[in-house]
Amino acid sequence: MAGWIQAQQLQGDALRQMQVLYGQHFPIEVRHYLAQWIESQPWDAIDLDNPQDRGQATQLLEGLVQELQKKAEHQVGEDGFVLKIKLGHYATQLQNTYDRCPMELVRCIRHILYNEQRLVREANNCSSPAGVLVDAMSQKHLQINQTFEELRLITQDTESELKKLQQTQEYFIIQYQESLRIQAQFGQLAQLNPQERMSRETALQQKQVSLETWLQREAQTLQQYRVELVEKHQKTLQLLRKQQTIILDDELIQWKRGQQLAGNGGPPEGSLDVLQSWCEKLAEIIWQNRQQIRRAEHLCQQLPIPGPVEEMLAEVNATITDIISALVTSTFIIEKQPPQVLKTQTKFAATVRLLVGGKLNVHMNPPQVKATIISEQQAKSLLKNENTRNDYSGEILNNCCVMEYHQATGTLSAHFRNMSLKRIKRADRRGAESVTEEKFTVLFESQFSVGSNELVFQVKTLSLPVVVIVHGSQDHNATATVLWDNAFAEPGRVPFAVPDKVLWPQLCEALNMKFKAEVQSNRGLTKENLVFLAQKLFNRRSNHLEDYNSMSVSWSQFNRENLPGWNYTFWQWFDGVMEVLKKHHKPHWNDGAILGFVNKQQAHDLLINKPDGTFLLRFSDSEIGGITIAWKFDSPDRNLWNLKPFTTRDFSIRSLADRLGDLNYLIYVFPDRPKDEVFAKYYTPVLAKAVDGYVKPQIKQVVPEFVNASADAGANATYMDQAPSPVVCPQAHYNMYPPNPDPVLDQDGEFDLDETMDVARHVEELLRRPMDSLDPRLSPPAGLFTSARSSLS
């Protein structure tokens, strides 16, 4: 049957080619109704050139005709009347056509099957665009559709069997009434004369015996029909359960997992349309079978016959009710999750959807959905069916919404657009747990009436865990909790259990996913970047990523304990990197201009043999979200320089590209790319001269130690090329600084740009004032500009 199911999905020219294969010699209706039988016969085993195989071909012809006749006999009622005549006609037609040449039937069917398979194969390989299968699904998805076709045919078959049972029972009841009428006639015989009474009595007795014999035999037949029908329903329910398990426990759970990973920056979870179509097919077939079972129960009540059927029917009825209950409750899902970091007094949205809403007439009486926030412990109690009514952990405004049915898309959903968490009630914290580690969830509840109020279901679904914050400063640590939960939560967990330790490669995958999403870049974390992060986290020196693969990272290491020697956690440092890139440096990161994940020693090793003026940009160790410039310039004191880190605050004043453009002695971006080639397109255009006669001041980046170098470089572009040849200094010299520290260098020998920028801003303010109006009291301290060695252009 699988071949015919695939053939039915052909389109365009391929479909037309398939239709040409059929005609009076072999009607397409025969192929359709006997698909399973035809595909299970050994057509290829017959040698068309061997007369000895004629007998086997004749048997196949006879089998085909018998199957058609049997199929015709099973068609009952008004719907089946025309089909019954057609199938009977086709049986006679094929018998007459191939009776004398059964080998031609074999040749015909082999030709049809071969070309069907060819068309399907070509469509799957996309060799003929017009004949492409609609569905480019995976093999598993194809199997799901094949199972649906099998369920559809089985349900059709049980419907025919039920109608046959009903007609047989109705005729039985008529004959039973005739038996009662005969029984009544015996009572009237006393009014007749003896001779006539005897003659009449004998005839009635013969008729009664014959009828009772028929009734006994027919009662057994009816009972057999009932048992066979129930057994078929039992098999149908087994297949339904299996199909429902695949869709709800595999495909839907996989979609939910994708939704969870999307919260960490993974690919979008995808449309629900395919899942909804499967769930709707399930609902339709389940409901049809349930109605058939109820009609069978009614027939048994109408004509009770001792036996096991009533008990069997009660069992299958209970089973199918359980199946539909599981379907309805499992397909009430959250299509759009609420924010997982939820700030109080802030508007947020969410969308819930019922995937079977259009098929079970739920939309005829639109249900209302209510949203509440509950704690992790309350969620655990809820799943244990413990009484938690009205036990909430906060108050959500605008938390009720009526589900709406959208005719065009066939979706039943509720859109919460203006919810707001008014207040939150926190639980007692455990040990070192902070408020940003406490998890809550939004509970959505409703009541659905199915099938004209035949069944009523209480449905509930929980959102992904949310962390509630009251201030923006808590956002970073709350995001860490969400990241860890989304990445490492296991299917079917108790809310909201998550491993306390994970392997380093698992964390690498989560960090890379988050990094690419936050920075909005296809340039993720390289192997070298991950080695740097591992060294930072584990305080190890190995440069081989494989050495860290078996190492575990605990939640405490990730975002509870500070890194050794620093006043921040691993996550806080990494999050700072993402934030500064996201806000200011996405294009530079995508261009490969920011090396980023290197420390001072690594920067020294990379630059030491490069020409003077070669520089690289790396993420600061001492400043969260800081970026520093390391560059090569040979001088009597040292040959490697590190500028004090810039932060988001600095880049909001002047961009990285403009700052680099100000420093003329920075010539090559590591390893050897000309600076202007990389950054010129990001320089701020020079403003035109003011028309009011005033000269507009500018803030420019200046490094005091290199003021002269800047001036010379401005006059002579080859200044850096004329500098002394680089000398490879020992590492001890790399860490040594002049004995008299410069007043604008910090204790690590890095330039204090905050002071430099403050001076520049002060000078700009002075230049904007008329000279004769300056108050001497506002003049800067004597020697300030000299000591700072700043320059203003």
Swiss-Prot record:
Gene, per the UniProt record: Stat5a
Family recorded in the similarity comment: Belongs to the transcription factor STAT family.
GO-annotated cellular components: cytoplasm; cytosol; nucleus; RNA polymerase II transcription regulator complex
Domain spans labelled SH2: 589-686
Keyword tags: Activator, Cytoplasm, DNA-binding, Lactation, Nucleus, Phosphoprotein, SH2 domain, Transcription, Transcription regulation, Ubl conjugation
Keyword Transcription part of the UniProt annotation: yes
InterPro entries xrefs: p53-like_TF_DNA-bd_sf, SH2, SH2_dom_sf, STAT, STAT5_CCD, STAT5a/5b_DBD, STAT_linker, STAT_N_sf
GO MF terms, alphabetically ordered: DNA binding; DNA-binding transcription activator activity, RNA polymerase II-specific; DNA-binding transcription factor activity; DNA-binding transcription factor activity, RNA polymerase II-specific; DNA-binding transcription factor binding; double-stranded DNA binding; phosphate ion binding; RNA polymerase II cis-regulatory region sequence-specific DNA binding
Region of interest (Disordered), residue spans: 772-793
Protein location: Cytoplasm; Nucleus
Functional note: Carries out a dual function: signal transduction and activation of transcription. Mediates cellular responses to the cytokine KITLG/SCF and other growth factors. May mediate cellular responses to activated FGFR1, FGFR2, FGFR3 and FGFR4. Binds to the GAS element and activates PRL-induced transcription. Regulates the expression of milk proteins during lactation.
Subunit-structure text: Forms a homodimer or a heterodimer with a related family member. Binds NR3C1. Interacts with NCOA1 and SOCS7. Interacts with ERBB4. Interacts with EBF4.
Modified residues annotated as Phosphoserine in this record: S128, S779
Gene source species: Rattus norvegicus
Modified residues (Phosphotyrosine): Y90, Y682, Y694
Any one Gene Ontology BP term: positive regulation of gamma-delta T cell differentiation
Post-translational modification: ISGylated. Tyrosine phosphorylated in response to KITLG/SCF, IL2, IL3, IL7, IL15, CSF2/GMCSF, GH1, PRL, EPO and THPO. Activated KIT promotes phosphorylation on tyrosine residues and subsequent translocation to the nucleus. Tyrosine phosphorylated in response to constitutively activated FGFR1, FGFR2, FGFR3 and FGFR4. Tyrosine phosphorylation is required for DNA-binding activity and dimerization. Serine phosphorylation is also required for maximal transcriptional activity.
Protein name: Signal transducer and activator of transcription 5A
